Each structure stands twice: as C-alpha cells, then as structure tokens.
C-alpha cells in the first residue's frame, strides 16, 4: 500500500497546536517615595534625660546637724566631760560619754543604727549595758570610735558604756560584772611566723 507524500503533508497541515504558555504575570503598582534630599532633613526630637536628686546631700546635712547637736551637748569636747569611759577591743578604741537624756545613741556624729548598718548583733552589743540596768531611755550616749572594724568597735563601745556607768554609781558594778560587761576581751589576731603561711599554717610537706 503506497502512501503519497502529498497526502501526508495535507494531513499534517490539518493538525492544530495549542500553546500552553502561561500568561505574562501582572506587576503590582508600587507607591513612589519622595527622593531623599539633604536640603530638607527630617526633624528629630531632642533627647530629654531626667535625673532624680541623690540622697547624699541629705545624709551630709543630717550628719552636720548631728555634729552641731553633739558639740552643743559636749562643750569642750569629749575629754572635758565627767562621765566618760574608754573601751578597747582588738584594734578598736571607743570613748563614750553619758549624759541624762532620752536614749539617743550617736556614734561619730551618726545615729547608731545607721553607723552599725542595722546589724542586730552589733546593736545588741552597744545597748546591753544600758538594758542590763534598765537605763535605755534615761541617758544619751555620745561615742567617738576609731580603728578596727564595726564588730570590734561595737564591742569596744559596750565596754566603754559599762565603764562610764560605773562613774554614775558604784552600785552598778555588781550587775554589770555578773553579765561580764566589765571584762576586757584581750583576744587579738595571732601574729604570722616566719617559714609559715599564716600564724600556724605550714606549707605542704613533701617527703620526696
């Protein structure tokens, strides 16, 4: 069976091809922005910083007021007073003056609670002699302390208050001595020895 070329060409010509190409994507409209120019810069609001006043000036004022109060109560200074006691503990030395008052306790021109940082143990040290005799609100206590730390100063103040109470009345000796408030605690840090790391600690021993 013979097929002519003309019949094949006519059959191919009758076929139709459809294109499956995707349509051209649509572009979204973009909003045009204004061009940046140095001649018209944007307005920037200034940065405002607010600061609260520090409490240091208030504390300084309170200290100055207490200093004036102490100097008005102690004319001539600590050494010129009659009821005075000296206490020592470790490296701390405290000179204590007692005056009849309402129970104020001032250490180095500052309130005792503030000076001793509110430590209940240290506050107990300084108030024990007065509490033993029931004089918590009968005397004002003025203290000048230096040397050592706050713990040593508190114990030195305790001894100084007890010794000052003896000058008020000799009858105070028995109750104060019974509580051990008149005994000078002579314990101090033991000195370092040569060849040792501390007072008694020796370097590690190696046999070989």
From Swiss-Prot:
The gene is PRPS9. It comes from the Eukaryota. NCBIfam families: PRK00132.1. The modification N-acetylthreonine is found at residue 52. InterPro entries: Ribosomal_Su5_D2-typ_SF, Ribosomal_uS9, Ribosomal_uS9_bac/plastid, Ribosomal_uS9_CS, Ribsml_uS5_D2-typ_fold_subgr. Residues 194-208 have a biased composition (Basic residues). SUPFAM superfamilies: Ribosomal protein S5 domain 2-like. Belongs to the universal ribosomal protein uS9 family. GO terms for biological process: translation. Residues 185-208 are annotated as: Disordered. The lineage of its organism: Eukaryota, Viridiplantae, Streptophyta, Embryophyta, Tracheophyta. Component of the chloroplast small ribosomal subunit (SSU). Mature 70S chloroplast ribosomes of higher plants consist of a small (30S) and a large (50S) subunit. The 30S small subunit contains 1 molecule of ribosomal RNA (16S rRNA) and 24 different proteins. The 50S large subunit contains 3 rRNA molecules (23S, 5S and 4.5S rRNA) and 33 different proteins. uS9c binds directly to 16S ribosomal RNA. uS9c interacts with translation factor pY (PSRP1). It is found in: Plastid, Chloroplast. Component of the chloroplast ribosome (chloro-ribosome), a dedicated translation machinery responsible for the synthesis of chloroplast genome-encoded proteins, including proteins of the transcription and translation machinery and components of the photosynthetic apparatus. Signal peptide: none annotated. GO terms for molecular function: RNA binding; rRNA binding; structural constituent of ribosome. The keyword Iron does not apply. GO terms for cellular component: chloroplast; plastid small ribosomal subunit. This is Small ribosomal subunit protein uS9c. Pfam families: Ribosomal_S9. Keywords: Acetylation, Chloroplast, Plastid, Ribonucleoprotein, Ribosomal protein, RNA-binding, rRNA-binding, Transit peptide. Residues 1-51 form a transit peptide.
């Amino acid at each position: 069976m013979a097929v002519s070329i003309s019949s094949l060409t006519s059959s191919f010509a009758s076929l139709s091809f459809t294109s499956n190409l995707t349509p051209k994507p649509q572009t979204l409209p973009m909003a045009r922005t204004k061009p940046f120019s140095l001649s018209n810069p944007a307005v920037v609001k200034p940065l405002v910083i607010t600061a609260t006043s520090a409490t240091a000036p208030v504390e300084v004022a309170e200290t100055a007021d207490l200093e004036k109060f102490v100097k008005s109560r102690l004319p001539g200074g600590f050494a010129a007073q009659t009821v005075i006691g000296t206490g020592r503990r470790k490296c701390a030395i405290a000179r204590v003056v007692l005056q009849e008052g309402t129970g104020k306790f001032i250490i180095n021109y500052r309130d005792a609670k503030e000076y001793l940082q509110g430590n209940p143990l240290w506050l107990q040290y300084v108030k024990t002699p007065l509490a033993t005799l029931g004089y918590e609100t009968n005397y004002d206590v003025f203290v000048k302390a230096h040397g050592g730390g706050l713990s040593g100063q508190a114990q030195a103040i305790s001894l100084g208050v007890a010794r000052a109470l003896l000058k008020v009345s000799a009858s105070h000796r028995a109750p104060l001595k019974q509580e051990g408030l008149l005994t000078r605690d002579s314990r101090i840090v033991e000195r370092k020895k040569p060849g040792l790391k501390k007072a008694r600690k020796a370097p590690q021993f190696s046999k070989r």
